[in-house]
From Swiss-Prot:
Gene Ontology cellular-component annotations: extracellular region
Protein source organism: Hybomitra bimaculata
Organism taxonomic ancestry: Eukaryota, Metazoa, Ecdysozoa, Arthropoda, Hexapoda
Signal peptide interval: 1-20
Top-level taxonomic group: Eukaryota
Tissue and organ expression note: Expressed by the salivary gland.
Name of the protein in question: Vasotab
Subcellular locations according to the entry: Secreted
Domain named Kazal-like: residues: 21-76
Main location: secreted
Keywords recorded for this protein, A-Z: Calcium channel impairing toxin, Disulfide bond, Ion channel impairing toxin, Secreted, Signal, Toxin, Vasoactive, Vasodilator, Voltage-gated calcium channel impairing toxin
Cystine pairs: 23-60, 27-53, 35-75
Gene Ontology MF annotations: calcium channel inhibitor activity; toxin activity; voltage-gated calcium channel activity
Amino acid sequence: MKFALFSVLVVLLIATFVAADECPRICTADYRPVCGTPSGGRRSANRTFGNQCSLNAHNCLNKGDTYDKLHDGECK
């Protein structure tokens, strides 16, 4: 019985770590724009993302092309 409980706990722990490494793939369609500025001093234009989730998803999926939130609202 103790072994079965231990096994279940190990599986749940592994599943938690695997799920934590996944990038958000589906964001809500609510338009709450955020302006992002390129991370790491890259010289490219600021970019408007549809919402914070979209910015986070972009950063997770594009490790070499990340943006920091500059402010709420569209980039000017």
